[in-house]
């Protein structure tokens, strides 16, 4: 055993390996390949509108365009533990395909008529040349600028290079770049999320954006894998407080289980449970005064959009109160008012409080938590 190394909880002979290398590459699975090759590369994944707020706080309608692309550079090398965007990407997407998708999105929403904001998501970094052709990047930047729309795109922190950010700022001044920080903690980034960068990289990226007059939006992940509910509530609250001064907007994304990911695997083995909606309400209440100090300008804007809220694969409660609680959280993201949570109550709130109390006093392995929906007898069966 002298030559044994540790991989997770098991000692194996030979060279140490990454967690992802212990799991069959999901992008090579027959089902995954069939799905990816089945969609039309000239049509966007989805296009829709939502209520939003402009940078100055004015209510508006935002168009969201999610495109089918070649995916994210980090996924090609390793990938995050929780991200299933590789399910919607394919290697053979060309510039012509992306231009066709962009045209289809504009046609679907009548050239974004009535929308003051446009969000363009590419399952990776919008302005990374290896992911998306430069001519298509320029088309999106210049057209949205000419339309007078506020543009939001996404990027990885380590890809926010000085020269590229300067180019983006020239083509669309004042746009917003959303960075997937996920956690303001280097250990969580490395061991829970497998993000591939550290917090100082995020800080450097934010400084670069602000130096060129662009807005910085930071994504945080609520309840990364291998973390209990109580720890998630404490850590995310702390992270919001720590990054508020450097972020024009903070978007907290509660974990939702995406297919063929590491999180999907541990979820199916009942070693992970998505967060409670009550935890999100409590988190908002805990940080509201830090984000919106009384009598002072707001330090940032807090956005919480629970994807798949109310389902067993998304943030959920007992099932009877999910719709009402999730709607209140969504309304807060637009209004920024704690009055949205007035009158919310359910019997399951006591169960949530008990779980938080246990999490903060006793170790809970892998953040498994309690089943809120599963039949007790079924829970005894093998996964």
Q: Which residues are covered by each model-predicted region?
A:
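Auxiliary Fe-S-binding modules of radical SAM enzymes
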Residues: 1-35, 257-383
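Canonical Radical SAM [4Fe-4S] cluster-binding loop centered on the CxxxCxxC motif
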Residues: 37, 43-100
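Structural recognition of alpha->loop->beta junctions
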Residues: 80, 172-175, 234-251, 322-350
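Active-site-proximal loop/turn and secondary-structure-junction residues that shape catalytic pockets
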Residues: 124-126, 157-159, 183-185, 222-226, ...
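Distinct, well-ordered alpha-helical segments
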Residues: 130-138, 161-170, 229-230
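Conserved C-terminal portion of the radical SAM core fold
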Residues: 200-261, 280-306
């Amino acid at each position: 055993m002298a030559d044994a190394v540790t991989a997770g909880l098991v000692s194996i002979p030979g060279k140490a390996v990454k967690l992802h290398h212990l799991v069959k590459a999901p992008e090579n699975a027959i089902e995954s390949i069939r799905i990816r090759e089945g969609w039309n590369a000239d049509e966007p994944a989805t296009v829709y509108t939502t209520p939003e707020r402009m940078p100055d706080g004015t209510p508006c309608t935002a168009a969201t365009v999610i495109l089918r692309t070649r995916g994210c550079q980090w996924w090609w090398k390793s990938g995050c533990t929780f991200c299933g965007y590789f399910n919607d990407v394919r290697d053979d997407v060309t510039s012509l395909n992306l231009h066709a998708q962009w045209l289809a999105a504009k046609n679907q929403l009548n050239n974004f008529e009535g929308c003051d904001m446009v969000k363009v998501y590419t399952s990776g970094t919008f302005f990374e040349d290896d992911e998306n052709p430069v001519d298509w990047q320029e088309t999106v930047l210049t057209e949205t600028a000419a339309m007078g729309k506020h543009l939001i795109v996404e990027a990885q922190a380590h890809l926010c290079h000085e020269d590229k950010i300067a180019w983006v700022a020239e083509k669309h001044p004042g746009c917003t770049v959303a960075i997937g920080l996920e956690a303001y903690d280097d250990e969580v980034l490395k061991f829970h999320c497998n993000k591939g960068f550290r917090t100082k990289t995020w800080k450097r990226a934010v400084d670069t954006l602000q130096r060129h007059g662009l807005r910085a939006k930071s994504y945080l992940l609520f309840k990364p894998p291998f973390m209990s509910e109580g720890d998630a509530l404490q850590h995310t609250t702390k992270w919001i407080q720590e990054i508020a001064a450097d972020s024009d907007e903070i978007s907290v994304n509660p974990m939702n289980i995406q297919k063929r990911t590491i999180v999907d695997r541990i979820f199916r083995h009942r070693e992970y449970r998505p967060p409670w909606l009550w935890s999100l309400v409590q988190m908002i209440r805990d940080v509201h005064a830090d984000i919106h100090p009384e009598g002072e300008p707001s330090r940032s804007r807090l956005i919480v959009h629970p994807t798949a809220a109310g389902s067993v694969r998304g943030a959920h409660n007992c099932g009877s109160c999910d719709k009402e609680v999730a709607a209140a959280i969504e309304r807060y993201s637009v209004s920024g008012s704690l009055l949205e949570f007035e009158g919310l109550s359910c019997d399951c709130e006591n169960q949530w409080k008990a779980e938080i109390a246990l999490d903060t006093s006793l170790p809970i392995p892998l953040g498994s938590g309690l089943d809120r929906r599963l039949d007790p007898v079924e829970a005894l069966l093998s996964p």
